Amino acid sequence: MNTSRSQAIFSAAQRLMPGGVSSPVRAFRSVGGQPIVFDRVKGAYAWDVDGNRFIDYIGSWGPAICGHAHPEVIAALQDALEKGTSFGAPCELENQLAEMVIDAVPSVEMVRFVNSGTEACMSVLRLMRAFTGRDKLIKFEGCYHGHADMFLVKAGSGVATLGLPDSPGVPRSTTSNTLTAPYNDLEAVKELFAENPDAISGVILEPVVGNAGFITPEPGFLEGLRELTREHGALLVFDEVMSGFRISYGGAQARFGVTPDLTTMGKVIGGGLPVGAYGGRAEIMEMVAPAGPMYQAGTLSGNPLAMTAGIKTLELLKQEGTYERLESTTERLINGILEAAKAAEVPITGNSIGAMFGFFLCEGPVRNFEDAKATDAERFGKLHRAMLERGIYLAPSAFEAGFTSLAHSEADIETTLKAFRESFAAVA
């Protein structure tokens, strides 16, 4: 496969941007080799600047659930562009998307739009403290909630890929109020509440982990967190930036029947444009300025283009049979991956929910981030390169979930599984 133009562009990029990228995982540091530079995307496919085509299982890290550049989304954006790219003022599109989110997500009675998942999580943390009058929070090892200082403690894929426990430049005083527990460990959470009476503002987690690889909640875990937070007067926050509208139309909370107090969202709700949101019970959300005293603002928040793409994407997802189709596609993919690895005698464990999937190159089960670290990252790097040579674009990290879309066809899945069979045989 010729990648000479990608190599030249990335070489130039390293003189212009730190590491040559705008987000660390894109640099391929954990899988080796140089990154592929994309030229365009359409449906389930991405083309690089050298003309190579790939079946894409990243989907812009989650937003492209309907497929890249869906014609109805593009048409809606073209119409919206004629009216301007940014208003900096209220627009009716915000109302429309807000109503759709409130209708879909069980916990959300009011919503505030922002520009990224990080911004949503930063804002919801401030809101947790404002509402409860408490400073501490509990997060889980391997759960990623953006790159805000207080969340960069045992934060999963980003820092794991770099081999860093957290990040230089984060003051110890900032993280001293961040308490961590292993995912799927209710007893550890009980101990933290016992050790910090009336001090914990809330518990935040990815209800389905996608940034420590793909890890699912054990039966009773989410329910147990709901009971504990109520018992201690703390808030339960689901970070559904990744799982929202991806594992079901109402996200993980609808799928598992556990309703948090607050929810953060992003990715899918922007239809591929920069967006984030946080929402929850009205009595909590009314703390947010200008309705209440907790300040949060943004120049591009509620951007009309992002709202337009989000509205059209959710309209497409709401069509009958959408999630059954996504689930079927993803199950066929992950089952085929597991079979291919086992045929090559490569240790593997994996799973899928909705349009998310993941696997670890180790014996299972994987219940938490500590278990995930047993994955054979070196072998995964070899597998990633082998798949890339066969035209399959996987996340360039052993600690990231994968994503399917409505655009992935049966032929795409079969082509992908053929590549996995060959690649597992090559790295066995």
Curated annotation (Swiss-Prot):
Pfam families: Aminotran_3. Its cofactor is pyridoxal 5'-phosphate. Keywords: Chlorophyll biosynthesis, Cytoplasm, Isomerase, Porphyrin biosynthesis, Pyridoxal phosphate. GO terms for biological process: chlorophyll biosynthetic process; protoporphyrinogen IX biosynthetic process. Pathway: Porphyrin-containing compound metabolism; protoporphyrin-IX biosynthesis; 5-aminolevulinate from L-glutamyl-tRNA(Glu): step 2/2; Porphyrin-containing compound metabolism; chlorophyll biosynthesis. It is found in: Cytoplasm. GO terms for molecular function: glutamate-1-semialdehyde 2,1-aminomutase activity; pyridoxal phosphate binding; transaminase activity. The modification N6-(pyridoxal phosphate)lysine is found at residue 267. GO terms for cellular component: cytoplasm. Homodimer. PANTHER family: GLUTAMATE-1-SEMIALDEHYDE 2,1-AMINOMUTASE (PTHR43713), GLUTAMATE-1-SEMIALDEHYDE 2,1-AMINOMUTASE 1, CHLOROPLASTIC-RELATED (PTHR43713:SF3). Belongs to the class-III pyridoxal-phosphate-dependent aminotransferase family. HemL subfamily. This is Glutamate-1-semialdehyde 2,1-aminomutase. The gene is hemL.
